[in-house]
Amino acid sequence: QDRYKKFPGDDNDAASRWTNPATISGDGNGAVGATGQATVIDCVGAGKDGENCRFWQHLRLSGFVGGDSGSWLAPQNAAGGILQAQNGALGLSALTICSTNLSGKIANAIDAQFDDGKPNTGQVRGTSNAAALNVTPTETAYVDDGGTVYVVCKTL
């Protein structure tokens, strides 16, 4: 937002700013996508190129993030999940970055390093219910049982 005065993905001048490769402009309303997306956002396939997906392409085109600047796919994390950008998640407001497919051990380490280590409070929040990103999580601790995976989100 510092360089272009707009959030990546929401930039309503993106199509004229970056023409090779081509991109799609956002609506310039100050938010990346709809508020509180209910689930993990799928950016794969035709018609799946909304602001949440274009967020990553705009960052690549601006040189802030490496990778194929023609792609709007979200980058993968080390656990095989994705990083996604959205306007609020898990009771957090404003631009939020979420990382999916994290084990309880990794989710707890991230939350403890940057916040309070509790999935339902603070500036870092997590849930094992990837279908309910639009509500505050109810879990009070991360479970490391080898099978439960989490989505962890933080407001930027």
Predicted regions and their residues:
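Low-complexity, acidic interaction segments enriched in glycine
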Residues: P8-L156
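N-terminal alpha-helical signal peptides/signal-anchor transmembrane segments
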Residues: Q1-F7
